[in-house]
Amino acid sequence: MSSYLLDTSALLTLRGNEAGAERVAELLREASTGKTECHGCFITLMEVLYRVWKNEGEAAGRGAYASCLKLPIIWLHESPALLERAASIKATHPLSFADAWIAASALELGATLVHKDPEFETLPGLLEERLPYKQ
């Protein structure tokens, strides 16, 4: 079975109905029927909450967070192995703190990372599905 990890950018793409939203929706439909697995990193939940809160207000942020929890996503939470992998990535690659956790999660699971973030392109061994980048 195929396994995908949805980056924060993928979930915000879906929420904003941006280019690539249909692909994210397709993966979630497949996950809901057991055809594939969709995963998410715990840090993505925080990113969705704070980004939407900052741009649209607290109620919208909390609503977006609650919506994420209802999606057919298996959420990966912090563990010692994941922490070490994220720290190694952060120490050796020019990624943000959150992106290091997200990349580590995809690598830990052997999942394809679905994203809109060119910074992920530099990581060796990371399976990627790139959504259309913003122009």
PLM segments and residue spans:
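Anion (oxyanion) recognition and catalysis
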Residues: 32, 69, 107
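Active-site neighborhoods of divalent-metal-dependent phosphate/nucleic-acid chemistry enzymes
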Residues: 73-116
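Helix-loop "lid/cap" segments that line or gate small-molecule binding pockets
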Residues: 51-54, 72
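Acidic, PIN/NYN-like endoribonuclease modules and their adjacent C-terminal/linker elements
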Residues: 1-3, 103-135
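A generic structural signal for short hydrophobic patches within well-formed alpha-helices
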Residues: 11-12, 45, 120-121
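Short, well-structured N-terminal submotif of metal-dependent ribonuclease cores
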Residues: 1-40, 53-66, 134-135
